[in-house]
Structures are given as structure tokens and as C-alpha cells.
Amino acid sequence: MTQQGNSGERKPRGKGPKRPRKPKVDPFSIGELEITDYKDVKMLRRFVSDTGKILPRRRTGLSAKHQRRIAQTIKVARQLALLPYTEKLVRK
């Protein structure tokens, strides 16, 4: 039997040209931010998604050490009800 149409060969799907990305800089390393305490909710919100999840390192650009400290600080703020565990979802 022969295949009709497609001869069995697949063309590689190109994702397009790769753009050089700007390296992310850890704001705590350069002194822009300081992990002061759990009460600085405005600073902690930068590292929480719209749904209330802690953002990963690849999105925040933090070092592993600072990511762990931020995660612990966010968890303390959640326990004290300064940050919500989840955001309310609005269904349409």
C-alpha cells in the first residue's frame, strides 16, 4: 500500500529566529531590593502571580538563595493573612 498525500516525511517546524535575551538580574544582589521582613506586602506581591502562586526563578530572575528566602517570607505573610493563598477567580 502506498500513502497518499504525505510521503511520510516531516518537515521540521521552525520556531523562527532566536532573539538574544537580556539576562535577568537579581534585584537583591545589586542592592535594588532588600528582603526586610514579611510585612512589606508591596514588595512581596512582585513575586506572586495573579492567581496567588509564587513565581518561579525563571520569571523573577532571582538567585536560588534569594528565591528560597522570598518563598519563606511569602509563606509567613500568608499565614499571618497579609497575602492571600489564592486569588478569587471570576467566572464569566
Curated annotation (Swiss-Prot):
SUPFAM superfamilies associated with the record: Ribosomal protein S18 (SSF46911)
Signal peptide region: none
GO biological process terms, semicolon-separated: translation
UniProt keyword annotation of Repressor present: no
Keyword field: Ribonucleoprotein, Ribosomal protein, RNA-binding, rRNA-binding
GO molecular function: small ribosomal subunit rRNA binding; structural constituent of ribosome
Pfam families for the chain: Ribosomal_S18
Basic residues bias (residue ranges): 12-22
Lineage top rank: taxon: Bacteria
The keyword RNA-binding belongs to this UniProt entry's keyword annotation: yes
Cellular component terms (Gene Ontology): cytosolic small ribosomal subunit
Region (Disordered): 1-28
Oligomer status and interactors: Part of the 30S ribosomal subunit. Forms a tight heterodimer with protein bS6.
NCBIfam families recorded: S18
PANTHER family, per the entry: 30S RIBOSOMAL PROTEIN S18 (PTHR13479), SMALL RIBOSOMAL SUBUNIT PROTEIN BS18M (PTHR13479:SF40)
Family: Belongs to the bacterial ribosomal protein bS18 family.
Record-given protein name: Small ribosomal subunit protein bS18
Organism: Deinococcus radiodurans (strain ATCC 13939 / DSM 20539 / JCM 16871 / CCUG 27074 / LMG 4051 / NBRC 15346 / NCIMB 9279 / VKM B-1422 / R1)
